[in-house]
Amino acid sequence: MPSGCSIRALWIINNQDTVVFSRRFPVVEKQWCSAYKTENENTGLDLPRLPTDQQISDSFTRRKRREGSTRGYGIRVAQSTKGSDSWVDDPITRHIISLCLTEEDDDDDDERNILWPIALHTKALYSILVLPLVEPKEMKDYVKLCRRSDCGPAVGEDLSLSSLLLNISSITGAFMVAHAFGDIISGDTVEPEVVVSVSPSVGGLFDSLTGSIGISSRAKPVAAPVASSNPSGAAITGATASDAPKAGSRLLDRDLLRNFIATAMPFGTPLDLSLSNISAMKANGFSSADPPPQELKQPAWKPYLYKGKQRLLFTIHETVSAAMYDRDEIPDNVSVAGQINCRAELEGLPDVSFPLAGLSTAHIEAISFHPCAQVPAHGIDKQNIVFQPPLGNFVLMRYQAGCGLGPPVKGFYQLSMVSEDEGAFLFKVHLMEGYKAPLSMEFCTITMPFPRRRIVAFDGTPSAGTVLTTEHSVEWRILGSGRSLSGKSLEATFPGTIKFSPLQSRRKGDGDDEESEDESAENVVNVEDFLVQKMNKDLPAAELEEPFCWQAYDYAKVSFKIVGASVSRMSIDTKSVNIYPTTKSPVEFSAQVTSGDYILWNTLGKAPSAAVV
Protein backbone atom coordinates (compact mmCIF):
# COMPACT_ATOMS: atom_id res chain seq x y z
CA MET A 1 0.00 0.00 0.00
CA PRO A 2 1.26 3.57 -0.69
CA SER A 3 2.76 5.56 2.16
CA GLY A 4 1.01 8.78 1.10
CA CYS A 5 -2.56 9.87 1.68
CA SER A 6 -5.54 8.28 -0.05
CA ILE A 7 -9.20 8.66 0.90
CA ARG A 8 -11.57 5.68 0.86
CA ALA A 9 -14.75 7.70 1.35
CA LEU A 10 -16.17 10.89 2.82
CA TRP A 11 -19.57 11.87 4.16
CA ILE A 12 -21.19 15.19 5.06
CA ILE A 13 -23.89 15.01 7.75
CA ASN A 14 -26.23 17.86 8.68
CA ASN A 15 -27.46 18.79 12.15
CA GLN A 16 -30.38 16.35 11.74
CA ASP A 17 -27.88 13.45 11.48
CA THR A 18 -28.74 12.91 7.82
CA VAL A 19 -26.11 12.26 5.17
CA VAL A 20 -26.53 15.06 2.63
CA PHE A 21 -23.44 14.31 0.53
CA SER A 22 -21.11 11.34 0.16
CA ARG A 23 -18.38 10.12 -2.14
CA ARG A 24 -16.61 6.76 -2.35
CA PHE A 25 -13.42 6.22 -4.31
CA PRO A 26 -13.36 2.76 -5.97
CA VAL A 27 -9.65 2.94 -6.84
CA VAL A 28 -8.67 3.39 -3.20
CA GLU A 29 -11.25 0.87 -2.03
CA LYS A 30 -9.70 -1.71 -4.35
CA GLN A 31 -6.36 -1.11 -2.62
CA TRP A 32 -8.00 -1.65 0.77
CA CYS A 33 -9.67 -4.89 -0.35
CA SER A 34 -6.39 -6.23 -1.72
CA ALA A 35 -4.53 -5.41 1.50
CA TYR A 36 -7.30 -6.95 3.63
CA LYS A 37 -7.24 -10.20 1.65
CA THR A 38 -3.46 -10.40 2.02
CA GLU A 39 -3.66 -9.81 5.78
CA ASN A 40 -6.48 -12.33 6.33
CA GLU A 41 -5.88 -14.90 3.59
CA ASN A 42 -5.77 -17.81 6.06
CA THR A 43 -8.64 -16.74 8.32
CA GLY A 44 -11.54 -17.09 5.92
CA LEU A 45 -13.09 -13.79 7.03
CA ASP A 46 -15.54 -12.11 4.70
CA LEU A 47 -14.37 -8.94 3.01
CA PRO A 48 -15.91 -5.87 4.75
CA ARG A 49 -17.59 -3.37 2.48
CA LEU A 50 -18.14 0.34 2.89
CA PRO A 51 -21.46 1.08 4.60
CA THR A 52 -24.39 2.79 2.95
CA ASP A 53 -25.34 6.38 3.73
CA GLN A 54 -28.18 5.15 5.93
CA GLN A 55 -25.81 2.94 7.91
CA ILE A 56 -23.45 5.87 8.40
CA SER A 57 -26.32 8.06 9.57
CA ASP A 58 -27.56 5.44 12.05
CA SER A 59 -24.05 4.73 13.36
CA PHE A 60 -23.29 8.43 13.79
CA THR A 61 -26.56 8.91 15.71
CA ARG A 62 -25.79 5.97 18.00
CA ARG A 63 -22.30 7.30 18.64
CA LYS A 64 -23.64 10.74 19.62
CA ARG A 65 -26.06 9.10 22.01
CA ARG A 66 -23.37 6.86 23.47
CA GLU A 67 -20.64 9.52 23.67
CA GLY A 68 -22.87 12.35 24.88
CA SER A 69 -22.20 14.74 21.96
CA THR A 70 -20.86 14.90 18.42
CA ARG A 71 -17.25 14.95 19.55
CA GLY A 72 -17.70 12.79 22.62
CA TYR A 73 -16.11 12.77 26.06
CA GLY A 74 -12.52 12.24 24.93
CA ILE A 75 -11.66 10.49 28.23
CA ARG A 76 -13.09 7.46 29.99
CA VAL A 77 -16.04 8.41 32.21
CA ALA A 78 -18.67 6.49 34.12
CA GLN A 79 -20.95 6.45 31.07
CA SER A 80 -18.27 4.97 28.79
CA THR A 81 -18.85 1.47 27.46
CA LYS A 82 -16.24 -1.03 26.35
CA GLY A 83 -15.48 -0.61 22.66
CA SER A 84 -16.44 3.07 22.52
CA ASP A 85 -14.10 5.94 21.65
CA SER A 86 -14.09 7.34 25.18
CA TRP A 87 -13.14 3.89 26.51
CA VAL A 88 -9.75 4.35 24.80
CA ASP A 89 -9.25 7.28 27.20
CA ASP A 90 -7.47 9.67 24.84
CA PRO A 91 -8.65 13.23 24.01
CA ILE A 92 -7.71 12.70 20.34
CA THR A 93 -10.84 10.54 20.03
CA ARG A 94 -12.82 13.77 19.93
CA HIS A 95 -11.33 14.40 16.50
CA ILE A 96 -10.43 10.92 15.20
CA ILE A 97 -13.51 8.79 15.78
CA SER A 98 -14.77 5.30 15.02
CA LEU A 99 -18.24 4.15 14.02
CA CYS A 100 -19.76 0.80 15.00
CA LEU A 101 -21.92 -0.37 12.10
CA THR A 102 -24.11 -2.71 14.19
CA GLU A 103 -26.41 -2.01 17.11
CA GLU A 104 -25.07 -4.85 19.28
CA ASP A 105 -22.23 -3.77 21.58
CA ASP A 106 -20.85 -7.33 21.51
CA ASP A 107 -19.81 -6.78 17.90
CA ASP A 108 -17.52 -3.89 18.75
CA ASP A 109 -14.50 -6.19 18.90
CA ASP A 110 -15.07 -7.39 15.32
CA GLU A 111 -12.99 -5.19 13.04
CA ARG A 112 -15.41 -5.81 10.18
CA ASN A 113 -18.10 -3.89 12.08
CA ILE A 114 -15.92 -0.90 12.95
CA LEU A 115 -15.04 1.98 10.65
CA TRP A 116 -11.78 3.64 11.73
CA PRO A 117 -9.97 6.07 11.61
CA ILE A 118 -12.48 8.77 10.67
CA ALA A 119 -11.33 12.39 10.74
CA LEU A 120 -14.20 14.46 12.17
CA HIS A 121 -14.47 18.16 11.39
CA THR A 122 -17.49 20.33 12.24
CA LYS A 123 -18.15 23.52 10.29
CA ALA A 124 -21.30 25.60 10.00
CA LEU A 125 -24.19 23.17 10.60
CA TYR A 126 -22.41 20.16 9.17
CA SER A 127 -20.10 17.35 10.29
CA ILE A 128 -17.52 16.24 7.72
CA LEU A 129 -16.34 12.63 8.06
CA VAL A 130 -13.26 11.53 6.08
CA LEU A 131 -12.08 7.90 6.04
CA PRO A 132 -8.43 7.56 4.94
CA LEU A 133 -6.71 4.41 3.72
CA VAL A 134 -4.79 2.59 6.48
CA GLU A 135 -3.18 -0.83 6.86
CA PRO A 136 -5.51 -3.60 8.12
CA LYS A 137 -2.94 -4.31 10.84
CA GLU A 138 -3.37 -0.77 12.18
CA MET A 139 -7.11 -1.38 12.29
CA LYS A 140 -6.58 -4.52 14.40
CA ASP A 141 -4.35 -2.59 16.80
CA TYR A 142 -7.10 -0.04 17.35
CA VAL A 143 -9.66 -2.76 18.08
CA LYS A 144 -7.33 -4.08 20.80
CA LEU A 145 -7.18 -0.62 22.36
CA CYS A 146 -10.98 -0.44 22.41
CA ARG A 147 -11.29 -3.69 24.38
CA ARG A 148 -8.59 -3.37 27.03
CA SER A 149 -9.65 -3.05 30.65
CA ASP A 150 -6.96 -0.67 31.89
CA CYS A 151 -7.57 3.08 31.66
CA GLY A 152 -5.32 5.32 29.59
CA PRO A 153 -1.95 4.62 27.96
CA ALA A 154 0.73 3.31 30.29
CA VAL A 155 4.15 4.94 30.50
CA GLY A 156 6.54 3.31 28.03
CA GLU A 157 3.78 1.26 26.45
CA ASP A 158 4.42 0.30 22.83
CA LEU A 159 0.78 0.15 21.80
CA SER A 160 -1.00 3.44 22.45
CA LEU A 161 -3.33 5.50 20.32
CA SER A 162 -0.83 8.35 20.01
CA SER A 163 1.99 6.10 18.80
CA LEU A 164 -0.39 4.35 16.44
CA LEU A 165 -1.59 7.59 14.85
CA LEU A 166 1.94 8.99 14.52
CA ASN A 167 2.77 6.14 12.15
CA ILE A 168 -0.28 6.77 9.93
CA SER A 169 0.66 9.49 7.46
CA SER A 170 -2.81 9.61 5.91
CA ILE A 171 -4.31 11.10 9.10
CA THR A 172 -2.89 14.55 8.33
CA GLY A 173 -4.14 14.40 4.75
CA ALA A 174 -7.61 13.36 5.91
CA PHE A 175 -7.86 16.42 8.15
CA MET A 176 -6.68 18.68 5.30
CA VAL A 177 -9.45 17.25 3.10
CA ALA A 178 -12.03 17.70 5.89
CA HIS A 179 -11.01 21.32 6.48
CA ALA A 180 -11.06 22.07 2.73
CA PHE A 181 -14.63 20.75 2.46
CA GLY A 182 -15.64 22.65 5.59
CA ASP A 183 -14.37 25.92 4.12
CA ILE A 184 -16.25 25.30 0.87
CA ILE A 185 -19.48 24.46 2.69
CA SER A 186 -19.35 27.57 4.88
CA GLY A 187 -18.06 29.86 2.13
CA ASP A 188 -14.93 30.56 4.18
CA THR A 189 -12.55 30.30 1.22
CA VAL A 190 -11.07 33.79 1.40
CA GLU A 191 -7.28 33.71 1.42
CA PRO A 192 -5.30 34.97 4.44
CA GLU A 193 -4.93 38.73 4.73
CA VAL A 194 -1.56 40.25 3.89
CA VAL A 195 -1.10 43.90 4.89
CA VAL A 196 1.23 46.28 3.05
CA SER A 197 2.04 49.93 3.71
CA VAL A 198 0.80 52.56 1.28
CA SER A 199 4.33 53.76 0.46
CA PRO A 200 6.37 50.60 -0.01
CA SER A 201 9.17 52.44 -1.79
CA VAL A 202 10.15 54.29 1.39
CA GLY A 203 10.30 51.06 3.38
CA GLY A 204 11.53 50.47 6.88
CA LEU A 205 13.31 53.83 7.28
CA PHE A 206 10.05 55.76 7.16
CA ASP A 207 8.39 53.30 9.54
CA SER A 208 11.20 53.62 12.07
CA LEU A 209 11.22 57.42 11.90
CA THR A 210 7.46 57.80 12.23
CA GLY A 211 7.26 55.10 14.89
CA SER A 212 9.82 56.83 17.10
CA ILE A 213 7.70 59.97 17.30
CA GLY A 214 4.42 58.13 17.85
CA ILE A 215 3.02 58.38 14.29
CA SER A 216 1.94 55.12 12.68
CA SER A 217 1.77 54.94 8.91
CA ARG A 218 -1.55 53.73 7.59
CA ALA A 219 -1.70 50.26 6.10
CA LYS A 220 -4.09 48.56 3.76
CA PRO A 221 -4.78 44.88 3.12
CA VAL A 222 -3.69 43.30 -0.12
CA ALA A 223 -6.47 41.69 -2.11
CA ALA A 224 -6.07 37.99 -2.60
CA PRO A 225 -6.73 37.27 -6.28
CA VAL A 226 -4.77 34.45 -7.89
CA ALA A 227 -2.29 35.65 -10.47
CA SER A 228 -3.15 34.89 -14.04
CA SER A 229 -1.00 32.63 -16.16
CA ASN A 230 -1.20 34.84 -19.24
CA PRO A 231 1.85 36.90 -20.23
CA SER A 232 0.24 40.20 -19.33
CA GLY A 233 0.18 39.21 -15.68
CA ALA A 234 -3.43 40.28 -15.18
CA ALA A 235 -4.97 39.05 -11.94
CA ILE A 236 -8.31 37.37 -11.52
CA THR A 237 -10.61 37.26 -8.53
CA GLY A 238 -12.24 33.98 -7.61
CA ALA A 239 -15.98 34.57 -7.54
CA THR A 240 -16.44 31.47 -5.44
CA ALA A 241 -14.33 32.89 -2.66
CA SER A 242 -15.63 36.44 -2.63
CA ASP A 243 -19.33 35.91 -3.32
CA ALA A 244 -19.92 32.92 -1.08
CA PRO A 245 -22.26 33.61 1.85
CA LYS A 246 -21.19 32.71 5.34
CA ALA A 247 -22.21 29.79 7.51
CA GLY A 248 -25.91 29.12 7.88
CA SER A 249 -26.96 31.48 5.05
CA ARG A 250 -26.95 29.06 2.13
CA LEU A 251 -27.74 25.49 1.19
CA LEU A 252 -25.18 22.82 0.45
CA ASP A 253 -23.84 23.27 -3.09
CA ARG A 254 -23.41 19.67 -4.21
CA ASP A 255 -22.32 20.61 -7.73
CA LEU A 256 -19.49 22.73 -6.33
CA LEU A 257 -18.36 19.82 -4.14
CA ARG A 258 -18.44 17.39 -7.07
CA ASN A 259 -16.43 19.76 -9.25
CA PHE A 260 -13.93 20.26 -6.45
CA ILE A 261 -13.48 16.50 -6.04
CA ALA A 262 -13.09 16.00 -9.79
CA THR A 263 -10.18 18.44 -9.84
CA ALA A 264 -8.62 18.21 -6.38
CA MET A 265 -8.82 14.45 -5.75
CA PRO A 266 -10.44 12.64 -8.71
CA PHE A 267 -9.26 9.15 -7.69
CA GLY A 268 -9.14 9.66 -3.93
CA THR A 269 -5.58 10.98 -3.64
CA PRO A 270 -5.47 14.74 -2.84
CA LEU A 271 -3.53 16.68 -5.47
CA ASP A 272 -4.26 20.35 -4.74
CA LEU A 273 -6.83 21.36 -2.12
CA SER A 274 -6.63 25.09 -2.87
CA LEU A 275 -9.99 26.23 -4.24
CA SER A 276 -8.45 29.46 -5.54
CA ASN A 277 -5.86 27.51 -7.56
CA ILE A 278 -8.53 25.24 -8.98
CA SER A 279 -10.77 28.19 -9.90
CA ALA A 280 -7.85 29.93 -11.63
CA MET A 281 -6.92 26.82 -13.58
CA LYS A 282 -10.50 26.43 -14.79
CA ALA A 283 -10.65 30.08 -15.82
CA ASN A 284 -7.23 30.32 -17.49
CA GLY A 285 -6.02 26.81 -18.19
CA PHE A 286 -2.28 26.23 -18.33
CA SER A 287 0.04 28.61 -20.12
CA SER A 288 2.63 27.19 -22.50
CA ALA A 289 4.63 30.41 -22.33
CA ASP A 290 7.81 30.40 -20.25
CA PRO A 291 7.69 26.79 -19.00
CA PRO A 292 9.99 25.99 -16.08
CA PRO A 293 13.41 24.50 -16.84
CA GLN A 294 13.42 20.73 -17.15
CA GLU A 295 15.75 20.32 -14.17
CA LEU A 296 13.20 22.09 -11.92
CA LYS A 297 10.21 20.11 -10.72
CA GLN A 298 7.03 22.17 -10.61
CA PRO A 299 5.33 21.59 -7.22
CA ALA A 300 1.65 20.73 -6.90
CA TRP A 301 0.93 23.92 -4.95
CA LYS A 302 2.11 26.08 -7.87
CA PRO A 303 0.27 24.73 -10.93
CA TYR A 304 1.44 27.56 -13.20
CA LEU A 305 3.95 30.39 -13.07
CA TYR A 306 3.50 34.03 -12.11
CA LYS A 307 4.24 36.78 -14.60
CA GLY A 308 4.38 40.47 -13.65
CA LYS A 309 5.85 42.94 -11.16
CA GLN A 310 7.73 41.09 -8.43
CA ARG A 311 7.47 41.61 -4.67
CA LEU A 312 7.42 39.58 -1.47
CA LEU A 313 5.05 40.39 1.41
CA PHE A 314 4.98 39.03 4.97
CA THR A 315 2.37 39.72 7.65
CA ILE A 316 2.40 38.40 11.20
CA HIS A 317 -1.16 38.16 12.50
CA GLU A 318 -1.55 37.32 16.18
CA THR A 319 -4.67 36.74 18.27
CA VAL A 320 -4.42 37.32 22.02
CA SER A 321 -6.74 35.41 24.35
CA ALA A 322 -6.83 36.02 28.07
CA ALA A 323 -8.67 35.22 31.28
CA MET A 324 -8.08 37.99 33.83
CA TYR A 325 -9.30 37.23 37.37
CA ASP A 326 -7.55 39.78 39.65
CA ARG A 327 -7.49 37.16 42.41
CA ASP A 328 -4.59 35.84 44.46
CA GLU A 329 -5.79 32.25 44.33
CA ILE A 330 -6.31 32.17 40.52
CA PRO A 331 -3.48 33.28 38.22
CA ASP A 332 -4.27 35.25 35.08
CA ASN A 333 -3.82 33.41 31.80
CA VAL A 334 -2.68 35.03 28.54
CA SER A 335 -1.89 33.14 25.33
CA VAL A 336 -1.04 34.13 21.75
CA ALA A 337 -2.03 32.25 18.59
CA GLY A 338 -0.10 33.57 15.61
CA GLN A 339 0.48 32.93 11.95
CA ILE A 340 2.81 34.30 9.29
CA ASN A 341 0.88 35.11 6.12
CA CYS A 342 2.83 35.46 2.91
CA ARG A 343 2.27 36.60 -0.66
CA ALA A 344 5.11 35.94 -3.11
CA GLU A 345 4.66 37.56 -6.50
CA LEU A 346 7.83 36.07 -7.95
CA GLU A 347 8.50 34.81 -11.46
CA GLY A 348 9.71 31.29 -12.05
CA LEU A 349 10.26 28.77 -9.26
CA PRO A 350 12.52 30.61 -6.82
CA ASP A 351 13.55 29.47 -3.36
CA VAL A 352 13.02 31.95 -0.51
CA SER A 353 14.91 31.66 2.75
CA PHE A 354 15.14 33.75 5.91
CA PRO A 355 16.02 33.31 9.60
CA LEU A 356 13.05 33.58 11.93
CA ALA A 357 14.17 35.60 14.94
CA GLY A 358 12.64 35.82 18.40
CA LEU A 359 11.99 32.14 19.08
CA SER A 360 13.46 32.16 22.60
CA THR A 361 11.82 35.41 23.68
CA ALA A 362 8.49 34.38 22.16
CA HIS A 363 8.36 31.18 24.28
CA ILE A 364 7.00 29.10 21.40
CA GLU A 365 4.81 26.23 22.63
CA ALA A 366 3.80 24.73 19.26
CA ILE A 367 4.73 25.42 15.65
CA SER A 368 3.72 24.08 12.22
CA PHE A 369 4.63 24.96 8.63
CA HIS A 370 3.06 24.99 5.17
CA PRO A 371 3.90 21.91 3.06
CA CYS A 372 6.05 24.12 0.79
CA ALA A 373 8.44 24.95 3.65
CA GLN A 374 11.55 23.18 4.87
CA VAL A 375 13.34 23.81 8.15
CA PRO A 376 16.90 22.56 7.60
CA ALA A 377 18.54 24.09 10.68
CA HIS A 378 17.57 25.75 13.92
CA GLY A 379 19.20 27.27 16.95
CA ILE A 380 18.26 28.64 20.34
CA ASP A 381 16.92 31.92 18.99
CA LYS A 382 16.93 31.45 15.22
CA GLN A 383 15.27 29.04 12.85
CA ASN A 384 16.04 29.07 9.14
CA ILE A 385 13.07 28.60 6.83
CA VAL A 386 13.39 27.69 3.15
CA PHE A 387 10.28 27.54 0.99
CA GLN A 388 9.13 27.57 -2.61
CA PRO A 389 6.05 29.80 -2.38
CA PRO A 390 2.71 28.97 -4.01
CA LEU A 391 0.53 31.52 -5.77
CA GLY A 392 -1.69 33.92 -3.86
CA ASN A 393 -1.86 34.54 -0.13
CA PHE A 394 -1.02 31.57 2.07
CA VAL A 395 -0.19 30.78 5.70
CA LEU A 396 3.52 29.99 5.88
CA MET A 397 3.59 29.16 9.59
CA ARG A 398 1.30 28.83 12.60
CA TYR A 399 2.39 28.93 16.22
CA GLN A 400 1.28 29.14 19.83
CA ALA A 401 3.31 31.38 22.10
CA GLY A 402 3.34 33.37 25.29
CA CYS A 403 2.73 37.12 25.38
CA GLY A 404 6.32 38.32 25.65
CA LEU A 405 5.37 41.96 26.24
CA GLY A 406 2.73 41.20 28.84
CA PRO A 407 -1.04 41.68 28.54
CA PRO A 408 -1.94 44.66 26.34
CA VAL A 409 -4.95 45.34 28.59
CA LYS A 410 -4.58 44.89 32.36
CA GLY A 411 -7.13 45.61 35.03
CA PHE A 412 -10.19 44.35 36.83
CA TYR A 413 -13.96 44.36 36.62
CA GLN A 414 -16.25 44.32 39.65
CA LEU A 415 -20.02 44.22 39.78
CA SER A 416 -21.96 43.87 43.01
CA MET A 417 -25.73 43.42 43.16
CA VAL A 418 -27.20 45.76 45.79
CA SER A 419 -30.69 44.40 45.12
CA GLU A 420 -32.36 41.90 42.80
CA ASP A 421 -32.61 44.47 40.01
CA GLU A 422 -29.79 46.93 40.66
CA GLY A 423 -26.01 46.66 40.71
CA ALA A 424 -22.92 48.84 41.06
CA PHE A 425 -19.86 48.20 38.89
CA LEU A 426 -16.28 49.43 38.59
CA PHE A 427 -13.67 49.09 35.86
CA LYS A 428 -10.01 49.97 36.21
CA VAL A 429 -7.81 49.17 33.21
CA HIS A 430 -4.29 49.94 32.04
CA LEU A 431 -3.69 49.93 28.26
CA MET A 432 -0.32 49.26 26.58
CA GLU A 433 1.70 49.25 29.81
CA GLY A 434 5.33 48.58 28.86
CA TYR A 435 4.60 48.84 25.14
CA LYS A 436 6.73 51.16 23.01
CA ALA A 437 6.68 52.43 19.42
CA PRO A 438 6.15 51.23 16.76
CA LEU A 439 3.38 49.34 18.59
CA SER A 440 0.12 51.27 18.32
CA MET A 441 -3.35 50.39 19.61
CA GLU A 442 -5.95 51.52 17.08
CA PHE A 443 -9.07 50.81 19.12
CA CYS A 444 -10.14 49.25 22.41
CA THR A 445 -13.65 48.41 23.56
CA ILE A 446 -14.95 46.67 26.69
CA THR A 447 -18.43 45.14 26.62
CA MET A 448 -20.53 44.00 29.59
CA PRO A 449 -23.08 41.47 28.28
CA PHE A 450 -26.35 40.79 30.12
CA PRO A 451 -28.11 38.28 27.83
CA ARG A 452 -30.55 37.18 30.54
CA ARG A 453 -31.47 40.60 31.95
CA ARG A 454 -32.93 43.68 30.26
CA ILE A 455 -31.33 47.04 31.08
CA VAL A 456 -33.79 49.81 31.98
CA ALA A 457 -31.45 52.43 33.48
CA PHE A 458 -27.76 53.18 33.48
CA ASP A 459 -25.58 55.82 35.14
CA GLY A 460 -21.82 56.23 34.88
CA THR A 461 -19.09 58.41 33.37
CA PRO A 462 -15.70 56.94 32.36
CA SER A 463 -12.44 58.83 32.73
CA ALA A 464 -11.74 58.22 29.03
CA GLY A 465 -13.83 57.26 26.03
CA THR A 466 -17.56 57.03 25.45
CA VAL A 467 -20.36 54.66 26.48
CA LEU A 468 -23.04 53.00 24.36
CA THR A 469 -25.89 51.00 25.90
CA THR A 470 -28.27 48.50 24.35
CA GLU A 471 -31.07 46.44 25.82
CA HIS A 472 -28.70 43.68 26.93
CA SER A 473 -25.21 45.20 27.05
CA VAL A 474 -23.06 48.18 28.01
CA GLU A 475 -20.18 49.04 25.66
CA TRP A 476 -17.27 51.20 26.80
CA ARG A 477 -15.30 52.55 23.85
CA ILE A 478 -11.97 53.59 25.35
CA LEU A 479 -10.18 54.17 22.04
CA GLY A 480 -11.69 54.75 18.64
CA SER A 481 -12.86 57.34 16.13
CA GLY A 482 -9.39 57.90 14.69
CA ARG A 483 -7.63 58.12 18.05
CA SER A 484 -4.77 55.66 18.56
CA LEU A 485 -2.36 54.98 21.42
CA SER A 486 1.35 54.72 20.56
CA GLY A 487 4.52 55.14 22.60
CA LYS A 488 2.67 55.62 25.89
CA SER A 489 0.21 53.90 28.20
CA LEU A 490 -3.27 54.89 29.32
CA GLU A 491 -5.01 54.28 32.64
CA ALA A 492 -8.79 54.57 32.69
CA THR A 493 -11.56 53.98 35.21
CA PHE A 494 -15.29 53.55 34.77
CA PRO A 495 -17.59 53.50 37.85
CA GLY A 496 -21.34 53.31 37.49
CA THR A 497 -24.67 51.76 38.40
CA ILE A 498 -27.06 49.69 36.33
CA LYS A 499 -30.71 48.77 36.80
CA PHE A 500 -32.55 45.82 35.27
CA SER A 501 -36.22 45.18 34.66
CA PRO A 502 -37.85 43.05 37.39
CA LEU A 503 -37.73 39.29 36.96
CA GLN A 504 -40.95 37.44 36.29
CA SER A 505 -41.16 35.28 39.41
CA ARG A 506 -42.64 31.82 39.12
CA ARG A 507 -45.90 31.15 40.89
CA LYS A 508 -45.53 29.04 43.99
CA GLY A 509 -47.69 25.91 44.00
CA ASP A 510 -48.06 25.90 47.76
CA GLY A 511 -46.60 27.40 50.89
CA ASP A 512 -43.74 24.88 51.08
CA ASP A 513 -41.67 26.80 48.54
CA GLU A 514 -42.09 30.03 50.45
CA GLU A 515 -41.03 28.33 53.68
CA SER A 516 -37.95 26.83 52.01
CA GLU A 517 -37.06 30.28 50.67
CA ASP A 518 -37.32 31.76 54.16
CA GLU A 519 -35.11 28.98 55.52
CA SER A 520 -32.50 29.59 52.84
CA ALA A 521 -32.52 33.29 53.67
CA GLU A 522 -31.76 32.47 57.30
CA ASN A 523 -28.95 30.08 56.34
CA VAL A 524 -27.22 32.51 53.97
CA VAL A 525 -24.96 34.89 55.83
CA ASN A 526 -23.96 37.07 52.87
CA VAL A 527 -26.83 39.19 51.58
CA GLU A 528 -25.42 39.25 48.05
CA ASP A 529 -25.20 35.44 47.96
CA PHE A 530 -28.86 35.31 48.91
CA LEU A 531 -29.77 37.76 46.14
CA VAL A 532 -27.88 35.73 43.54
CA GLN A 533 -29.48 32.52 44.78
CA LYS A 534 -32.94 34.07 44.61
CA MET A 535 -32.38 35.54 41.13
CA ASN A 536 -31.16 32.23 39.72
CA LYS A 537 -34.52 30.65 40.50
CA ASP A 538 -36.27 32.99 38.10
CA LEU A 539 -33.63 33.45 35.39
CA PRO A 540 -34.43 31.91 32.00
CA ALA A 541 -32.14 29.30 30.48
CA ALA A 542 -28.83 30.58 29.11
CA GLU A 543 -28.59 31.11 25.37
CA LEU A 544 -26.15 28.95 23.42
CA GLU A 545 -24.46 32.12 22.16
CA GLU A 546 -23.53 33.07 25.75
CA PRO A 547 -22.81 29.75 27.49
CA PHE A 548 -20.82 31.35 30.33
CA CYS A 549 -23.61 33.68 31.47
CA TRP A 550 -25.25 31.34 33.95
CA GLN A 551 -25.99 34.21 36.32
CA ALA A 552 -27.19 37.77 35.83
CA TYR A 553 -23.58 38.91 35.45
CA ASP A 554 -20.24 37.16 35.03
CA TYR A 555 -17.69 38.83 32.77
CA ALA A 556 -16.71 41.67 30.46
CA LYS A 557 -15.14 41.11 27.05
CA VAL A 558 -12.28 43.22 25.69
CA SER A 559 -11.80 43.91 21.96
CA PHE A 560 -8.77 45.67 20.51
CA LYS A 561 -6.40 45.91 17.56
CA ILE A 562 -2.66 46.63 17.68
CA VAL A 563 -0.41 47.30 14.68
CA GLY A 564 3.31 47.84 14.21
CA ALA A 565 4.79 44.64 15.67
CA SER A 566 3.87 41.35 17.31
CA VAL A 567 3.26 41.01 21.04
CA SER A 568 5.09 37.66 21.18
CA ARG A 569 8.28 39.34 19.85
CA MET A 570 8.22 37.12 16.77
CA SER A 571 9.69 39.07 13.84
CA ILE A 572 11.19 38.88 10.35
CA ASP A 573 14.21 40.92 9.29
CA THR A 574 13.52 41.91 5.68
CA LYS A 575 17.25 42.46 5.07
CA SER A 576 17.92 38.80 5.86
CA VAL A 577 15.41 37.46 3.31
CA ASN A 578 17.20 35.77 0.40
CA ILE A 579 15.67 34.86 -2.96
CA TYR A 580 17.42 32.39 -5.26
CA PRO A 581 17.90 32.92 -8.17
CA THR A 582 18.64 36.47 -7.08
CA THR A 583 16.09 39.08 -8.16
CA LYS A 584 15.52 42.73 -7.30
CA SER A 585 12.24 42.19 -5.50
CA PRO A 586 11.16 44.46 -2.63
CA VAL A 587 10.43 42.65 0.62
CA GLU A 588 7.84 44.15 2.96
CA PHE A 589 6.84 43.17 6.47
CA SER A 590 3.91 44.16 8.68
CA ALA A 591 2.28 42.90 11.85
CA GLN A 592 -1.11 43.22 13.48
CA VAL A 593 -2.58 41.89 16.71
CA THR A 594 -6.27 41.41 17.47
CA SER A 595 -8.14 40.20 20.52
CA GLY A 596 -9.65 36.75 20.74
CA ASP A 597 -11.57 35.66 23.84
CA TYR A 598 -10.11 38.36 26.08
CA ILE A 599 -12.17 38.11 29.26
CA LEU A 600 -12.22 40.18 32.46
CA TRP A 601 -14.00 37.97 34.97
CA ASN A 602 -16.04 39.68 37.65
CA THR A 603 -13.83 39.70 40.73
CA LEU A 604 -16.88 39.51 43.00
CA GLY A 605 -18.66 36.76 41.05
CA LYS A 606 -18.10 33.19 39.98
CA ALA A 607 -15.47 32.34 37.38
CA PRO A 608 -14.30 29.05 35.84
CA SER A 609 -10.63 28.16 36.12
CA ALA A 610 -8.41 25.16 35.48
CA ALA A 611 -6.51 23.72 38.42
CA VAL A 612 -2.77 23.28 37.89
CA VAL A 613 -1.71 19.76 38.91
UniProtKB/Swiss-Prot annotation:
Annotated protein name in UniProt: AP-5 complex subunit mu
Domain MHD: 309-563
Keyword Ribonucleoprotein among record annotations: no
Region: Disordered, residue numbers: 501-522
High-level lineage: Eukaryota, Viridiplantae, Streptophyta, Embryophyta, Tracheophyta
BP GO annotations: intracellular protein transport; vesicle-mediated transport
Superkingdom field: Eukaryota
Similarity comment text for this entry: Belongs to the adaptor complexes medium subunit family.
Complex and partners: Probably part of the adaptor protein complex 5 (AP-5).
Topology versus the membrane: Peripheral membrane protein
